[in-house]
UniProtKB/Swiss-Prot annotation:
This is Large ribosomal subunit protein uL11. It comes from Lacticaseibacillus paracasei (strain ATCC 334 / BCRC 17002 / CCUG 31169 / CIP 107868 / KCTC 3260 / NRRL B-441). PANTHER family: 60S RIBOSOMAL PROTEIN L12, LARGE RIBOSOMAL SUBUNIT PROTEIN UL11M. The gene is rplK. One of its GO terms (cellular component) is cytosolic large ribosomal subunit. Forms part of the ribosomal stalk which helps the ribosome interact with GTP-bound translation factors. Belongs to the universal ribosomal protein uL11 family. GO terms for molecular function: large ribosomal subunit rRNA binding; structural constituent of ribosome.
C-alpha cells in the first residue's frame, strides 16, 4: 500500500548550500522533516550545479519520511547567467540592461523543457523570451 502524503513543501535553494538555518530549517521543521537528512541529500545531489538556485519539491509522508524532486533552475537565473548580469531592469520597458541571442534563448529553453508546459522547443523559446523581455533584456535575432 502506498504511503499517505501529509504535506508538500516547495523551496528554492542555492545548489549545494542547503543549511538548517532560515529559511530552509524552519520550513522543513514545520513539515516534520529530518532537517539534517534533507540538507545532506540535497547538497550531495546538487553539488555539480554550484552557483545556481534549484527549485525543489519535497513530499512529506505521514510516517515523517520524505522524497524530493529537484527541478531545473528558474529561467530568470539562467538568463542572468547567460547575459552576465547581476539582476534585471527595474523598468524593463524603458531601460534595457542586457542582450541575449536566439541561440542562448534556445539553449535555455532546451534546458528548461522538462519543467515547462510547452509542446515543443519553439513554444518553450517564446516563454523564455517573454521572461527575458520582462527582465529588461533585449532578444537579438
Amino acid at each position: 500500500m502506498a504511503k499517505k502524503v501529509a504535506n508538500i513543501v516547495k523551496l528554492q535553494i542555492p545548489a549545494g548550500k542547503a543549511t538548517p538555518a532560515p529559511p530552509v530549517g524552519p520550513a522543513l521543521g514545520q513539515a516534520g522533516i529530518n532537517i539534517m537528512g534533507f540538507t545532506k541529500d540535497f547538497n550531495a545531489r546538487t553539488a555539480d550545479q554550484a552557483g545556481m538556485i534549484i527549485p525543489v519539491v519535497i513530499t512529506v509522508y505521514e510516517d515523517r519520511s520524505f522524497d524530493f524532486v529537484t527541478k531545473t533552475p528558474p529561467a530568470a537565473v539562467l538568463l542572468k547567467k547567460a547575459a552576465g548580469v547581476e539582476h534585471g531592469s527595474g523598468e524593463p520597458n524603458t531601460k534595457k540592461v542586457a542582450k541575449v541571442t536566439k541561440d542562448q534563448v534556445k539553449e535555455i529553453a532546451e534546458t528548461k523543457m522538462q519543467d515547462l508546459n510547452a509542446a515543443d522547443v519553439e513554444a518553450a523559446m517564446r516563454m523564455v523570451e517573454g521572461t527575458a523581455r520582462s527582465m529588461g533584456f533585449e532578444v537579438e535575432g
